[in-house]
C-alpha cells in the first residue's frame, strides 16, 4: 500500500516535506477506509490545525480546497493506539532511571509511534516515596514527534504484598491517613492519571471518591480482594481493573474475586467497569482472552504492560537491577527461563487479540483506542476519528501492520519497506 502525496502549493519545499512537517494545511486523505462509528467505511479523512474536520462547512462555507491530497493506497485509517500501562521500553525503566527520566520518557515516546501508539501513561511500579518525589515532577508533559503523555499511572505502592508480583515488598505501603497518605507518598497528585491499589487495603471509604473527584482513575489490582471488596470499591468510584487475571485471586465459583466484576449486578447503573488485559501471547492464555471478551466486551482495554526490553534486539541487556535476555520475542532473567515482563508492542497485541478471539477488526482496534479513551473520559479528544477530535491516527494494512503514524495531523513515523 503506497501512500502518494499531491500538494497544490507552489512553495519550493517538496510535497513530502509539506505533509510530514505541517499541521496547519488542510489535508485530505483519500483512497482509504476509516474506522468510525464502530465500523469500517469508505470515506475521506480531512485534517487541519491538528484536528479532524467536517468537510461540509469547509466546502460550502469557506469554499476551501485541500492544500494536499494523500492517496492512502487503500489503507485502513484508525485512531492512534492508547496504552494505559507501560513500564518503559527501548532500554528505559520509568521506575528506576530517576536521573535521566526526562530523556528516558522522550526515548520511549518516540519509539512507541513505530507501533501506532499516539498516547500513553508512563507507569511507575511500587517505589520508595523519594523516588516518586523525584520522578513525577520531571516527567515531561509532551515530547516533540513522540506519543502524547496523558498522565502517570501509579501502579502501587498501596497493594497487597501477597500479590506483589515483581514489585519490591519493602516499598509497599498502607493508606493509614486517608488521602493525605497518598499526597505524602507521591509528593503531588497533579500529574497522576491512574492509581492502581488493592481495595481490601483501603480502610477509609472516602479515599476512592476523593481521588475520582480530582480526575484520577482508580484501578483495582495486585490484590487478594473478594468480589464484595471489588464491588464496594466500584460503588465508591473505581472504574478499572489492572491487568485482568494477573496478580489477583483466580476465579472461583463461590467467590470470583475481581474477575467477577465483569458480570457483577452490583455495579451502579450506567457505569462501565473497564479492565486492562495483556494479549502478548505469553501472559494471558487465548482461552482467557476469549472469556474476558465474551463476558464483558464493552470494558476490555488492551495494554502492553511492557518493560524496558521492549524494542530491543535479541541478546542480553543490563537494565535496572537485573540483566535481561531477549529471545524468541520474550524477555527472561538472563541465564534462566524465568519470564520478567512483556515486550510485545501494541500493534502486535492487537493482532494477537484479534486472532485469539476471532473478533472483528474494528473491535480489536477499539479495544486499543476507544475503550481506553472512554475509561479516562477523554473520548471527545482521543480514541475516535470523529469531527473535532485530535488528529492522532495510524495507517494500517489489511494485516493490521503499521504503515505510518500521525499526531496532531503531522506524520511522526513511516514504516520503511
UniProtKB/Swiss-Prot annotation:
<feature type="binding site">
    <location>
        <position position="243"/>
    </location>
    <ligand>
        <name>a divalent metal cation</name>
    </ligand>
</feature>
<keyword id="KW-0119">Carbohydrate metabolism</keyword>
<feature type="binding site">
    <location>
        <position position="155"/>
    </location>
    <ligand>
        <name>a divalent metal cation</name>
    </ligand>
</feature>
<dbReference type="InterPro" id="IPR011059">
    <property type="entry name" value="Metal-dep_hydrolase_composite"/>
</dbReference>
<dbReference type="InterPro" id="IPR032466">
    <property type="entry name" value="Metal_Hydrolase"/>
</dbReference>
<dbReference type="InterPro" id="IPR006680">
    <property type="entry name" value="Amidohydro-rel"/>
</dbReference>
<keyword id="KW-0378">Hydrolase</keyword>
<keyword id="KW-0479">Metal-binding</keyword>
<comment type="similarity">
    <text>Belongs to the metallo-dependent hydrolases superfamily. NagA family.</text>
</comment>
<feature type="binding site">
    <location>
        <begin position="166"/>
        <end position="167"/>
    </location>
    <ligand>
        <name>substrate</name>
    </ligand>
</feature>
<dbReference type="InterPro" id="IPR003764">
    <property type="entry name" value="GlcNAc_6-P_deAcase"/>
</dbReference>
<feature type="binding site">
    <location>
        <position position="222"/>
    </location>
    <ligand>
        <name>a divalent metal cation</name>
    </ligand>
</feature>
<dbReference type="GO" id="GO:0106279">
    <property type="term" value="P:negative regulation of UDP-N-acetylglucosamine biosynthetic process"/>
</dbReference>
<dbReference type="GO" id="GO:0046872">
    <property type="term" value="F:metal ion binding"/>
</dbReference>
<feature type="binding site">
    <location>
        <begin position="339"/>
        <end position="341"/>
    </location>
    <ligand>
        <name>substrate</name>
    </ligand>
</feature>
<feature type="active site" description="Proton donor/acceptor">
    <location>
        <position position="305"/>
    </location>
</feature>
<protein>
    <recommendedName>
        <fullName>N-acetylglucosamine-6-phosphate deacetylase</fullName>
        <ecNumber>3.5.1.25</ecNumber>
    </recommendedName>
</protein>
<dbReference type="GO" id="GO:0006046">
    <property type="term" value="P:N-acetylglucosamine catabolic process"/>
</dbReference>
<feature type="binding site">
    <location>
        <position position="254"/>
    </location>
    <ligand>
        <name>substrate</name>
    </ligand>
</feature>
<feature type="binding site">
    <location>
        <begin position="246"/>
        <end position="247"/>
    </location>
    <ligand>
        <name>substrate</name>
    </ligand>
</feature>
<feature type="binding site">
    <location>
        <begin position="280"/>
        <end position="283"/>
    </location>
    <ligand>
        <name>substrate</name>
    </ligand>
</feature>
<dbReference type="GO" id="GO:0008448">
    <property type="term" value="F:N-acetylglucosamine-6-phosphate deacetylase activity"/>
</dbReference>
<dbReference type="Pfam" id="PF01979">
    <property type="entry name" value="Amidohydro_1"/>
</dbReference>
Amino acid at each position: 500500500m503506497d501512500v502518494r502525496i499531491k500538494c497544490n502549493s507552489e512553495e519550493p519545499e517538496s510535497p513530502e516535506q509539506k505533509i510530514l512537517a505541517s499541521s496547519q494545511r488542510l489535508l485530505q486523505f483519500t483512497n482509504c477506509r476509516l474506522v468510525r462509528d464502530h465500523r469500517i467505511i469508505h470515506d475521506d479523512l480531512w485534517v487541519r490545525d491538528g484536528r479532524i474536520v467536517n468537510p461540509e462547512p469547509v466546502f460550502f462555507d469557506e469554499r476551501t480546497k485541500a492544500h494536499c491530497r494523500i492517496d492512502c493506497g487503500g489503507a485502513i485509517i484508525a485512531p492512534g493506539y492508547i496504552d494505559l500501562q507501560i513500564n518503559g521500553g527501548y532500554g528505559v525503566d520509568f521506575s528506576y532511571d530517576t536521573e535521566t527520566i526526562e530523556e528516558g520518557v522522550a526515548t520511549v515516546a518516540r519509539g512507541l509511534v513505530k507501533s501506532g501508539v499516539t498516547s500513553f501513561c508512563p507507569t511507575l511500579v511500587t517505589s520508595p516515596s523519594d523516588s516518586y518525589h523525584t520522578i513525577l515532577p520531571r516527567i515531561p508533559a509532551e515530547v516533540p514527534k513522540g506519543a502524547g503523555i496523558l498522565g502517570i499511572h501509579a501502579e502501587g505502592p498501596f497493594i497487597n504484598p501477597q500479590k506483589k508480583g515483581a514489585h519490591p515488598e519493602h516499598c509497599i505501603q498502607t493508606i493509614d491517613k486517608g488521602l493525605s497518605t497518598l499526597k505524602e507518598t507521591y509528593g503531588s497528585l497533579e500529574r497522576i492519571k491512574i492509581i492502581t491499589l488493592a481495595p481490601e487495603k483501603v480502610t477509609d471509604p472516602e479515599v476512592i471518591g476523593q481521588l475520582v473527584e480530582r480526575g484520577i482513575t482508580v484501578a483495582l489490582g495486585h490484590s487478594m480482594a473478594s468480589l464484595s471488596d471489588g464491588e464496594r470499591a466500584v460503588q465508591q468510584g473505581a472504574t478499572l481493573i489492572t491487568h485482568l487475571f494477573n496478580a489477583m485471586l483466580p476465579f472461583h465459583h463461590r467467590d470470583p474475586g475481581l474477575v467477577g466484576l465483569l458480570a457483577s449486578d452490583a455495579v451502579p447503573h450506567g457505569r462501565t467497569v473497564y479492565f486492562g488485559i495483556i494479549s502478548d501471547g505469553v501472559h494471558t492464555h487465548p482461552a482467557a482472552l476469549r472469556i474476558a471478551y465474551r463476558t464483558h466486551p464493552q470494558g476490555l482495554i488492551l495494554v502492553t504492560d511492557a518493560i524496558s526490553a521492549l524494542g530491543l534486539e535479541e541478546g542480553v541487556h543490563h537494565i535496572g537491577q537485573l540483566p535481561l535476555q531477549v529471545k524468541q520475542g520474550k524477555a527472561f532473567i538472563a541465564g534462566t527461563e524465568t519470564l520478567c515482563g512483556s515486550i510485545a508492542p501494541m500493534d502486535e497485541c492487537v493482532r494477537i487479540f484479534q486472532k485469539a478471539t476471532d473478533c472483528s477488526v474494528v473491535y480489536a482496534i477499539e479495544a486499543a483506542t476507544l475503550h481506553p479513551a472512554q475509561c479516562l473520559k477523554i473520548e471527545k479528544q482521543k480514541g475516535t476519528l470523529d469531527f473535532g477530535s485530535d488528529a492522532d491516527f495510524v495507517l494500517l494494512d489489511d494485516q493490521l501492520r503499521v504503515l505510518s503514524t500521525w499526531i496532531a495531523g503531522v506524520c511522526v513515523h513511516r514504516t520503511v519497506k
